From Swiss-Prot:
Stabilizes free radical intermediate (site feature) positions: H190
Annotated residues for binding of a quinone: H215, S264, F265
Residues the entry annotates as binding pheophytin a: Y126
Catalytic activity: 2 a plastoquinone + 4 hnu + 2 H2O = 2 a plastoquinol + O2
Protein family (similarity comment): Belongs to the reaction center PufL/M/PsbA/D family.
Positions contributing to Fe cation binding: H215, H272
Entry's Gene Ontology BP terms: photosynthetic electron transport in photosystem II; response to herbicide
Sites where the protein binds [CaMn4O5] cluster: D170, E189, H332, E333, D342, A344
Cofactor note: The D1/D2 heterodimer binds P680, chlorophylls that are the primary electron donor of PSII, and subsequent electron acceptors. It shares a non-heme iron and each subunit binds pheophytin, quinone, additional chlorophylls, carotenoids and lipids. D1 provides most of the ligands for the Mn4-Ca-O5 cluster of the oxygen-evolving complex (OEC). There is also a Cl(-1) ion associated with D1 and D2, which is required for oxygen evolution. The PSII complex binds additional chlorophylls, carotenoids and specific lipids.
Organism: Arabidopsis thaliana
Protein modification: Phosphorylation occurs in normal plant growth light conditions. Rapid dephosphorylation occurs during heat shock.
Function: Photosystem II (PSII) is a light-driven water:plastoquinone oxidoreductase that uses light energy to abstract electrons from H(2)O, generating O(2) and a proton gradient subsequently used for ATP formation. It consists of a core antenna complex that captures photons, and an electron transfer chain that converts photonic excitation into a charge separation. The D1/D2 (PsbA/PsbD) reaction center heterodimer binds P680, the primary electron donor of PSII as well as several subsequent electron acceptors.
Protein name: Photosystem II protein D1
Length: 353
């Protein structure tokens, strides 16, 4: 009888824990995805802060030339970064216990792998937590779908690209200047600016900014007057009020006359779907582009595509970009390569004897 009572008490304790985890009454919703999200993001954040401040230089290229990334080793906020794991490690899983010592682990850039893998797990769980909370509240699932765009982009540069290139040393450094270096080298090696999926991503980000500014300014300009000239217009809104706070008919009429009638949405729901979908689809395509270029399916090559009647090349902007790419390629990892890959790939002339 005693054993039965103890088991019921145990089940009751577990039940209370489950109810607390999945309760929508908590100040911050936890959820089952949150059970994994919280420790992974805390780990990634803690190690990032410590490494950004104090990590020793990392042998990123595997040629015994360490690169400094932390503040205590001479960097500032702009130049500092978490240096990617060494090319000597490649794609190997490299936790602390796989190294002979902590010094070796730090020298080979172990913190980068630790941060990136925990971060990707954490943001994926954050996306799942968004879906989970929406489900509990009876909402539609599109918040998590929208968040999948930045998750896909982060996964592309931190995981898919290193897998395709064969080493975590090719992943994006965790810092401002390191990100710029990643972008420059990516252009040099993959001609990303000439990739149509990147172009769609640019249209998504810039177009999303434009549409967001247009929508915000239209709404702000067509607010229903509820205040005097001496009060802030924001005081005319009360949280939870039933009536509209702006005149969508006036906004529609203004924009329809500014451009043309059918350029203006007359349905608030379809308008907001468009505002969400445009940048999300664009960033999806960019992530897809990074993931294809990871395996060297690169941007368009229009080099020397225009010639005159004598066969002489007439340079286009594609040729100017190609010249810039070659310049960037010979300058990066100067001591790791004797020639840029494009030049080194040419077969040597055959010799007799």
């Amino acid at each position: 009888m005693t054993a039965i009572l103890e088991r019921r008490e145990s089940e009751s304790l577990w039940g209370r824990f489950c109810n607390w985890i999945t309760s929508t009454e908590n100040r911050l919703y936890i959820g089952w995805f949150g059970v994994l999200m919280i420790p992974t993001l805390l780990t990634a954040t803690s190690v990032f802060i410590i490494a950004f401040i104090a990590a020793p230089p990392v042998d990123i290229d595997g040629i015994r030339e360490p690169v400094s990334g932390s503040l205590l080793y001479g960097n500032n906020i702009i130049s500092g970064a978490i240096i990617p794991t060494s090319a000597a490690i490649g794609l190997h899983f490299y936790p602390i216990w796989e190294a002979a010592s902590v010094d070796e682990w730090l020298y080979n850039g172990g913190p980068y792998e630790l941060i990136v893998l925990h971060f990707l797990l954490g943001v994926a769980c954050y996306m799942g937590r968004e879906w989970e909370l929406s489900f509990r509240l009876g909402m539609r699932p599109w918040i998590a779908v929208a968040y999948s765009a930045p998750v896909a982009a982060a996964t592309a540069v931190f995981l898919i690209y290193p897998i395709g290139q064969g080493s975590f040393s090719d992943g994006m450094p965790l810092g401002i200047s390191g990100t710029f270096n990643f972008m420059i080298v990516f252009q040099a090696e993959h001609n990303i600016l000439m990739h149509p999926f990147h172009m769609l991503g640019v249209a998504g980000v810039f177009g999303g900014s434009l549409f967001s500014a247009m929508h915000g300014s239209l709404v702000t300009s067509s607010l229903i007057r509820e205040t005097t000239e001496n009060e802030s217009a924001n005081e005319g809104y009360r949280f939870g009020q039933e009536e509209e706070t702006y005149n969508i008919v006036a906004a529609h009429g203004y924009f329809g006359r500014l451009i043309f009638q059918y350029a203006s949405f007359n349905n608030s729901r379809s308008l907001h779907f468009f505002l969400a979908a445009w940048p999300v689809v664009g960033i999806w395509f960019t992530a897809l582009g990074i993931s294809t270029m990871a395996f060297n399916l690169n941007g368009f090559n229009f080099n020397q595509s225009v010639v005159d009647s004598q066969g002489r090349v007439i340079n286009t902007w594609a040729d100017i970009i190609n010249r810039a790419n070659l310049g960037m390629e010979v300058m990066h990892e100067r001591n790791a390569h004797n020639f840029p890959l494009d030049l080194a790939a040419v077969e040597a002339p055959s010799t007799n004897g």
